[in-house]
Amino acid sequence: DLNSGRYSKVYGISHTDPYTNIDGVARTLSFTYRDVTQFVSASSDFSSESLSIGVDYGYPITEFQGLRVGLSAQRSSLITGEGSAQQARQWVQSNGDYRQQIVPEQDFGEGFVIPGTTLDTTQFDSYDLVIGWSYDSRNRALFADRGMRHSLSLSYALPFSDVQYATANYDYLQFVPIIGSWTMAFAAEVGYSQELGDTTAPPPYRNFFAGGPDTVRGFRESRLGPKDSFGNPYGGNLKVTARAELLIPTPEKWRASARASIFFDIGNVFSTTDFYKFTGADGVTPVEYKFGYDKLRQSTGIAVQWLAPLGVFRFSYALPLNTFEGDGVQFADEEERFQFTIGQAF
C-alpha cells in the first residue's frame, strides 16, 4: 500500500493467510509507516510520524458474522511549531516524552534569512489491543438493495503504553425494500475515544471529523465541530452521524453501475474532554463543544453514484437545514452545497 499526497505519506506492507487452520481463521501481518502534516486538508500545521507493526486474526462465526482480534505496537513522534494550534501544542507538552527544540536562525546570504523558531516535540510508544465484530447480510457489496451490515470495533492502549486511551466505533447500514424497486437505506455511525491513566486527552490523530460527502452533505468537508485557535477544524472525541436515503429505481441496464437517491443527513462531532480550552472567533471568549441535540447539523438533497473504472463517482447537491450563521463569538458553519468525491458506494 503506497499513498503519497500533499498532507500525508503512508507506506504499508501486509500479508494475509486466509486459512491459518482448518476452521477458516485468517491471519494478517502488517507493517506501516505514516508521515502526516495535516489530518484533514483544512487543519492547522501538525506533524505526526509513526511506525507500527501488527498481527490480526479474523475468525468466522457464521456465514454472515465474524470476529477480529489484533495486537499492534506503534512508535509515534509529534511535532508542533508556531503554525500549530494552541490545542495541539497543549497535548504535545503534556503527554509522552516532551522536549523543546530550538531551531536557530539560518542565514543563506544576500538577504535570504530564515528566522529561528521553537518546536515542541513528543515521542511515545503505544501497544493496542483491537477487538472487532461484524455482521453483513447484504445481497451484494456494491449497490446492495437488501440486507444489513453492523460493525463494532474496540481499541485499547495497554497499561504499559506511554499514552493510554480507548476508542470505540460502531457502524450500521441497512436496506429496506418498500414496494417494487423502491428501497430505503439507513446508516449511522458513532465513534468515541477516551483518555486513560495519566494521559490528558486522546492523541489528536484519534480525533473524529464531520461534514462532507461521507457524513453530513451540504457542509464543507471536516469543517463541523470543534475549531482550534486559528479557526481551523480540530476534530473531537465524539462523533454522531446518521442518514436516510430513498433509492430511486434505476433502469435494469444501469442498475449494476448507477444509483440515484433523495437523502436526509444529520450529525456532528463534539469534544467531551475538559483538557482542551477552546476560544471563539474573537480569540478570547471560552466556548465549549459538548454534545447537544440542537448542535446536530441537518441537510437534505439529491445524490447520484456512478461506478466508473477509477472507482465510484459520487455527486450530491444538498440544502443545509439548520446552518449556524455565527454570533460574533462562535464560528459560523461553512456550507458547500454541491459536492463530488470518488470512493466507496453507500
Question: Where are these predicted regions, by residue range?
Answer:
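Solvent-exposed, glycine/polar-rich loop segments of beta-barrel outer-membrane systems
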Residues: 87-113, 198-223, 271-300
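C-terminal structured "cap/appendage" subdomains that terminate the fold
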Residues: 276-331
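Extracytoplasmic gating/loop element in the C-terminal half of outer-membrane beta-barrel translocons
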Residues: 180-277
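Short loop/turn motifs that connect adjacent beta-strands in outer-membrane beta-barrel proteins
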Residues: 19-26, 62-66, 80, 139-148, ...
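Gram-negative/organellar outer-membrane beta-barrel architecture
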Residues: 1-142, 148-149, 217-218, 222-224, ...
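Transmembrane beta-barrel strands of outer-membrane/channel proteins
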Residues: 2-4, 29-35, 69-75, 148-156, ...
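Transmembrane beta-barrel strand/turn architecture of Gram-negative outer membrane proteins
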Residues: 49-61, 149-158, 163-196
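Outer-membrane beta-barrel architecture
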Residues: 14-16, 52-56, 132-134, 151-153, ...
